[in-house]
Regions:
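Glycine- and charge-enriched loop/helix tracts that form the active or gating conduit
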Residues: 1-131, 135, 139, 143-161, ...
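Residues at alpha-helix termini
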Residues: 44, 177, 236, 287-288
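Short, glycine-/Ser/Thr-/acidic-enriched flexible segments
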Residues: 46, 83-85, 140-145, 196-198, ...
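Histidine/acidic-rich helix-loop-helix segments that form or flank divalent-metal centers
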Residues: 60-69, 96-129, 179-249, 270
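Alpha-helical hydrophobic/aromatic positions enriched in membrane-embedded helices and signal peptides
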Residues: 133-134, 229, 272, 281
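Terminal helices and disordered tails flanking the catalytic cores of nucleotide-processing hydrolases
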Residues: 179, 197-209, 240-332
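Short, mixed-charge, low-aromatic patches
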Residues: 30-38, 122-128, 145-147, 209-217, ...
Length: 332
């Protein structure tokens, strides 16, 4: 059991197989109170032997609106993520909540309960849950903040590229833990793209601008199914950043973004997220009389984006658009 594992002195963990350690960690991450479990592991001093890259987060300070250091923030995101997922399960009753933020969440996103349940029932690997992979990604989402921390002239703390670099670190750990490629890819996407939700939220709150169809299309093109996880992490990240200082306005903006993304993904995917294919590469090459090459893939992607934004809706329009693009490329 985990407890016996703990009883061996921390330094003996080096002798335990990475798979065995991984299984224990994933059991904790996929089970109840993942935040408390990770806090316990940190206090027991086992991270240097299990996941040394996590130790650096402790005590790393951040600017407003953050109220916690990077490690405390990470734990609080795990806690909020657990609560958010629980409040979206089938059979959750609003009476269970006495907290305004959760109430607003279930009001805005409650209609997606069945889709969320199906999302977590999908398997990336027979031995481990999608849920555990999501919590692993949340544990690592800010892992590269310590390494990317800088302070600008105004005294603001910045963490440039911590998302992209964090995805690489988590992916490396995933390989050492012998996770499946599907799991590693899911974890990478969640960490790499975790700032996009915040950009959407602040644009909506600050400029009253909803994400464009192009932005929604690109979000899911890059994230795929991980887009659902990104919405959950985004909401948990916001609560774990502001804590008690979170305003109803910001939370409502975030829930609107969540709703917009999820309804596009789940309720009308053929409109923006995954428009139906109007023609394939061979047909395009025939129509334009061009040989195989990178340009074919680029044109097909540009057509899809045109469909997503509503500019292109028929095969004829797709061909005409491609002719124009090809001309531009040739004269460019």
């Amino acid at each position: 059991s985990t407890r016996e594992l703990m009883k061996q002195s921390a330094s003996d963990l080096g002798r335990v197989s990475p798979e065995r350690l991984r299984d224990e960690i994933f059991k904790m991450l996929g089970g109840p109170k993942p935040d408390a479990c990770m806090r316990a592991l940190e206090m027991l001093g086992v991270f240097p032997y299990l996941m040394p890259e996590l130790s650096a987060m402790k005590g790393v300070t951040q600017s407003e609106p953050h109220i916690y250091d990077v490690w405390e923030h990470t734990l609080s995101v795990l806690g909020y993520l657990e609560a958010i997922i629980a409040s979206l399960r089938i059979g959750y009753s609003a009476e269970e909540t006495n907290d305004m933020f959760t109430g607003l969440l279930t009001l805005r996103l409650g209609r997606f309960r069945e889709q969320f349940t199906a999302h977590f029932a999908n398997s990336l690997n027979t031995d481990r849950s999608v849920r555990a992979a999501l919590f692993f990604a949340a544990l690592y989402h800010d892992v590269q903040k310590p390494a990317t921390r800088s302070v600008d002239e105004a005294g603001r703390v910045r963490f440039f590229d911590h998302d992209v670099k964090g995805a690489e670190v988590a992916s490396q750990r995933g390989r050492e833990f012998n996770l499946s490629n599907d799991e590693i890819e899911r974890i990478e996407k969640i960490i790499k793209h975790h700032m996009r939700f915040h950009f959407f939220t602040s644009r909506l709150e600050g400029d009253k601008q909803e994400p464009s169809r192009k932005a929604i299309y690109r979000f899911f093109r890059d994230a795929g199914e991980a887009g659902v996880d990104l919405v959950l992490v985004g909401l948990a990240d916001l609560r774990g950043t502001r804590g008690p200082a979170l305003t109803q306005e910001t939370w409502t903006a975030a829930l609107d973004i969540a709703r917009i993304l999820l309804e596009n993904y789940w309720e009308r995917p053929q409109e923006t997220v995954a428009p139906p294919r109007l023609l394939d590469g061979n047909e395009l090459m025939r129509e334009l009389n061009i040989p195989p090459g990178r340009i074919v893939g680029q044109l097909l992607e540009a057509i899809r984006e045109g469909q997503a934004t509503g500019k292109i809706s028929t095969r004829e329009e797709a061909v005409a658009f491609s002719r124009e693009e090809l001309k531009k490329a040739e004269t460019g």
